[in-house]
């Protein structure tokens, strides 16, 4: 899926029967306003919208900058969106499957000039990655393999492959360039200014009191 254009259309046909069912069920929860715990993670300022923090790292409408910090034992991928920091442990083993951190469990190694990062053990609430630009579903045992390859002084080629036999009938892949913007990251102070979620829930309670049905979420806009 070069450039990730129309990515949802490209992977829609790759869902298994079980995968499509779970995807539809997860998308249906977006029409529930019973409380904050059931609302999307981006609305709750827990992780960024969609898959902006990765893996795979996919662009959204804004705050797409990523700062890469490297030490002898770790690589940190800091996304400007919600300040998601993914720590990649170099030349280590994965944790036990029962350990499911936000953004998954990432381990990496170098293959010639490419940094290869393999991530699995995803956190259950992150099964549905949904934004205006992309949307897909993955199980906790989904495996994402990423490759970061410098192609110029100011560019890294980012490539990834998603494998999840329970959800997809075959693997799917994509790539996009990561260009050096020369800009600094700004603080994404989500909780401090999050008036949207209280407003969403207050609107739902008013609709309940008035006996009004919620307008269904347009899947093309979520």
What is each of the regions a protein language model found here?
Residues 7-8, 12-222:
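PEST-like low-complexity, intrinsically disordered acidic/proline/serine-rich tracts
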Residues 2-6:
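Positively charged, low-complexity/disordered segments
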């Amino acid at each position: 899926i070069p450039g990730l254009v129309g990515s949802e259309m490209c992977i829609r046909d790759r869902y298994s029967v079980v995968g499509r069912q779970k995807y539809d069920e997860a998308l249906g929860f977006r029409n529930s306003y019973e409380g904050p715990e059931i609302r999307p993670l981006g609305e709750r300022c827990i992780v960024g919208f969609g898959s902006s923090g990765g893996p795979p790292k996919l662009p959204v409408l804004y705050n797409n900058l990523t700062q890469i910090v490297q030490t002898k034992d770790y690589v940190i991928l800091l996304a400007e969106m919600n300040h998601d920091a993914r720590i990649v442990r170099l030349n280590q083993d994965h944790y036990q499957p029962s350990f499911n951190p936000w953004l998954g469990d990432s381990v990496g190694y170098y293959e010639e000039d490419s940094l290869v990062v393999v991530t699995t053990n995803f956190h259950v609430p992150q099964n549905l990655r949904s934004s205006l630009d992309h949307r897909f579903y993955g199980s906790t045992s989904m495996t994402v393999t990423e490759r970061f390859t410098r192609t110029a002084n100011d560019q890294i080629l980012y490539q990834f492959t998603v494998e999840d036999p329970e959800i997809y009938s075959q693997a799917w892949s994509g790539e996009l360039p990561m260009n050096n913007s020369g800009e600094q990251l700004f603080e994404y102070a989500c909780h401090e200014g999050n008036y949207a979620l209280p407003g969403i829930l207050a609107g739902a309670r008013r609709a309940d009191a008035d006996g009004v049905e919620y307008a269904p979420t347009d899947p093309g806009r979520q």
